[in-house]
């Protein structure tokens, strides 16, 4: 099953065409690496794939649901905001700067979005967060604050936070 399809994606900033007719698909269980020199469009492609940046033209499909497509003039048109919010539940991001909230424990960092954004049950979210911490191996650090963690532990906490969504 294809989780993500990007077809004929184009993106320009001023006179600089950053993405030039890029197409790719990612199937369930597949691992994909995007490699290139600085300024080659890697981050822009990921930002377009995750709806943080709009494409000039192209098609974006998650699990068969179209998030964006071209109109008759060849410009990208996006689905309604309510549909995009549903689609955004399919993915989470971990940035180079992990941005864990410094005044929250690791556990609270993981639980915050599922509780506030998804309005999920606190006991259910707590159980899931602890399971994620166990898998990510900083389970003994659930009460620690980001400044008390190594960079690797911060990264794993951030990955657990993304997976919790």
Predicted regions span which residues?
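ABC family nucleotide-binding domain
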Residues: 2-165
């Amino acid at each position: 099953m294809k989780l993500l399809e990007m077809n004929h994606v184009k993106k320009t900033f001023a006179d600089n065409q950053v993405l030039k007719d890029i197409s790719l698909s990612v199937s369930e269980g597949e691992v994909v690496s995007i490699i290139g020199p600085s300024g080659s469009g890697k981050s822009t492609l990921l930002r377009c794939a995750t709806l943080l940046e709009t494409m000039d033209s192209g098609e974006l499909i998650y699990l068969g649901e179209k998030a964006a497509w071209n109109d008759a003039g060849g410009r990208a048109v996006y689905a309604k905001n309510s549909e995009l919010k549903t689609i955004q539940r399919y993915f989470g991001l971990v940035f180079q700067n992990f941005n864990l909230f410094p005044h929250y424990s690791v556990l609270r960092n993981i639980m915050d979005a599922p509780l506030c954004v998804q309005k999920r049950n606190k006991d259910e979210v707590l159980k899931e967060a602890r399971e994620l911490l166990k898998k990510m191996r900083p389970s003994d650090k659930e009460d620690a604050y980001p400044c008390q963690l190594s960079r690797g532990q911060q990264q794993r906490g951030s990955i657990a936070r993304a997976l919790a969504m």
